[in-house]
Amino acid sequence: YREPLAKARSTVAESYKFIESDLDSAILYAPDMPMSNYTPTHAQAGKTTAQALKAKVLLSKGDYVNAALLADEVIQTAGNYGYGLVDFMSIFSDMFDSPEVLFAPYVSNYEEQCSFILDRTTYSSYSQKIADAMDPTPGNKETGEGYDPRFAAPFLTPDVITTSFKNGKYPHSTNDDGKSNTYYFLRLGEVYYIHAEAEARQGGNHLAAARTSLQTVLDAHVPGVYDVSTIPDNQLLEMIRQHKWIDLLFENQEEWYDMIRYYKHGDLDITTIRPNIKSDK
């Protein structure tokens, strides 16, 4: 018998190496499109999802050159496997069958249902602040007028059971199972934001590619509303973050990790958003 010994905590570099190795194996061996009963499924992860996840890891790591290259590869090849950007709210009515969903795991027991946990979530004051800044017109929370549709639609969807309003990204009864339990872990739209940020952080002639990706995802989700060519170069990174925040609101909590990354780069004073943060350790 030997007493258990505490193992030293892995370094950040070791952790990244392990995660990247795992994702490299998935990229090498995972199917191009996962199948369930001979039907393509987005509830399982395939090669494209692994590539997108690695691009996300590289962005967090600060390897912007390779994050941009890999995100662009996903964008360029996604259509070969049935993935693509779609109308924003159709993502959430089609759930994990949506072409935009790269990976959306689900559970089947009532107690564990994502819809039960998330369907009553609402926006924060900071989320509303971002939405207000995007459209100077006074917003009406009853009709959604004056708000970006990506912000308004989630809380303006009637409950199919009670006719009261609930979170429109989870527009189904909490008693449902199967597809109604979709948890939006990763969408193709997020890959466009990853690519946009990774290019923008390289500056110079990379800004054009950043604008192209940002404009493409905005045209798909809120057509005719935004013209990214009017964004000054020194505000582009922040606008990418804000659009990504509104787009992914109520989904995978990515906005928190974005705030940390922007803070560490000196792009954002995180204490103006969360004053109770006392340390970056």
What do the predicted segments below correspond to?
Residues 1-189, 201-209, 233-235:
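Structured, solvent-exposed acidic/aromatic patches
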Residues 192, 207-223:
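Active/binding-pocket-proximal capping segment
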Residues 114-117, 128-129, 136-141, 230-281:
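Long, intrinsically disordered, low-complexity segments
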Residues 196:
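Active-site-proximal region of nucleotide-activated glycan assembly enzymes
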Residues 102-104, 190-193, 239, 249:
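Structural recognition of the beta-strand scaffold that forms the well-ordered cores
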Residues 199-201, 205-212, 226-228, 250:
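Extended hydrophobic-aromatic, low-complexity segments
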